[in-house]
Structure formats: C-alpha cells, structure tokens
Amino acid sequence: MRHFLTLNDFSKDEIEQMINLARKIKKEAKTREFKPYLKDQKLAMIFEKSSTRTRVSFDVGMHELGGYALFLSKNDIQIGRGEPIRDTARVISRMCDMAMLRVDKHETLEEFAKFSSVPVINGLSDKFHPVQLMADYLTMLEFSAGEKVAYVGDGNNMTHSWLMLASKLGLELRVATPKGYEVDAGILKMANENAKISGAKIFITNDIKEAVNGADVVTTDTWVSMGQEAEKEKRLKDFAGYCVDENLMSLAKKDAIFLHCLPAYRGYEVSEAVFERHADEIFSEAENRLHAQKGVMVWLDERRR
C-alpha cells in the first residue's frame, strides 16, 4: 500500500504512470464515459483548511469514478476537540477506502498515514501541495510547454512541491524569492540529491529577471497564504517588485505559459493583464486538479491489491 504525501516518495516512472492514467481518464470523461474504477469506494475528506478547488475536485472526481466522498471539517469530527490523530486515522480507515487531508501541519498528515490502513492523500499541508503539481504538470503537457520553469514568489509549499517535481522528472527550475522567504534548506537538499540522478537543473535566486529569462513556464502563488493574515502588511511590502506583469513575462519565451494554483490576487503576485492573457492556461490547470487526482486515486487503489 502506498500513500501520496509528497512527490519525493515516488520515482519518475511512477509519477508518469499517474499522469498517463489521468490523461486516459480525462479523455474518457470528455466523451462522458465514466468508468467505475473506484466503484462503491468511500473517500474521507478531512479539512482543517477551507478550499474551493480541493473540495470540489475530489468530491466530483470520486463520484465520476463510481465512489463517493464524505466531507469532514475539523469541527465535524473529534480532531477538533482533541482526539489523537492516530485514533481518528484508525477509525476512519476501518470505515472508508481512502482518505484525503488538507491540513495546517505536514506532521498531522504523516501521523495520520502512519496509523491508517488505507491510502492517504495530501490535499495540502504547510510543506507540500503535491496534487496541485500533478495538475500543473498535466497542464504543461497539454499546452506543449518546454521544461524550463520559473517560480516567482514565496518559498512555500508550492515552491517545495515544484522542487520535488522538477528534481524527479529532470526539469530545469529557477526559483526567485525575496530575501528572508527562501525555500526550506532541507527540502532544497533533497531536490539537489534527486537532481544528481535525474539531471534536473535547480537554480535559486532573489533576482526575478534572472529566473524568468528564457522560461517556458512562469508560475507564482499568493503572497499571503491562509494563516498568514497577521503578516499581510509586512509581506506586501517585502514582496513589492515580485509581481508577474507584462514586462516580466516579456523576458520569458514568446510562447511561454503562465500558471497559478489560485486563488489569485490581481495587482499583487500577478497583473490583471497577464492573468487574463493566460486565463485559458490557468483555468485548464484548475480543471486538471479533477483529472490529475483521479489518476492518483486510481493508481493508489491499484497498488493495494
């Protein structure tokens, strides 16, 4: 049995297997051919953090695969009242076939997975957001984007997940963050170790122009994530100059695509003009959460038999 907590847990071949499954299932769905890959299976969705895309995509995805999803906020279950994670994991995994958690701390996810007897999926944690990166990579393939990726912004869970994806698949990744907001040193070390095997090129800088120059894909994320509201004023000041606008995009390749995991705050991390010019890519990326996650769930199910 396998869990889906971070892309660092998978080989290049395994990641590509999941992506190929996602492409196959998406093609079937476009013709309204919904095969019951997960017939009558139950997905427990545990949310410590609210979401639009994560909730809708997993709920709809499970339904289209022949199963159903159960939404559980932290206030709906005893986790919110102090029940140990290990106990919740053992109860839920006796009643459900799979669990997806969107949590504040990655350690919560690891503890749940340790005591779960069914596959556990990371729907988001403070360290990683791997399901989003599966959607991003699927979108890159669909738009025939090249392999040079520039990430501009906070060294957060999205950046860490890009480091894992790029280092596993052999992509070139350039990360530009303001000083004081760099990526986690331990995660960067893991990425560099992976790169020695895959041939990936990892470049870290504080210079956004250096990062974006000649890029095939430019991506960013919000400057103020959930739980960081108290830091908003300081962050807006520190990230000034890190907006992906038309001038910055002009440094990328002419056919470069722009990705954003959403929600986007126009005028901050991305300009209105760039967002609307690349809206098809961005909303295809959002839709691909549905398809990529189907691929992940089916892949996990196949490997517990």
Swiss-Prot record:
Task: Quickly give the catalysed reaction.
Answer: carbamoyl phosphate + L-ornithine = L-citrulline + phosphate + H(+)
Q: Which keywords does the record carry? A: Arginine metabolism, Cytoplasm, Transferase
Transferase is among the record's keywords: yes
The entry's carbamoyl phosphate-binding residues are 51-54, 78, 102, 129-132, 261-262, 289
Q: Which HAMAP family does this entry report, sorted A to Z?
A: OTCase (MF_01109)
Q: Where in the cell is it found?
A: Cytoplasm
Which EC class is this protein assigned? transferase
Give coiled-coil spans as residue ranges: none
Residues the record lists as binding L-ornithine = 157, 221, 225-226
A GO molecular-function annotation: ornithine carbamoyltransferase activity
The superkingdom listed in its UniProt entry is: Bacteria
Chief localisation class: cytoplasm
Quick one: which pathway?
Amino-acid degradation; L-arginine degradation via ADI pathway; carbamoyl phosphate from L-arginine: step 2/2
Q: Give the originating organism.
A: Campylobacter concisus (strain 13826)
E.C. number: 2.1.3.3
Q: Which Pfam families match?
A: OTCace, OTCace_N
User: What is this protein identified as?
Assistant: Ornithine carbamoyltransferase
Q: Entry's InterPro entries?
A: Asp/Orn_carbamoyltranf_P-bd, Asp/Orn_carbamoylTrfase, Asp/Orn_carbamoylTrfase_sf, Asp_carbamoyltransf_Asp/Orn-bd, Orn/put_carbamltrans, OTCase_ArgI
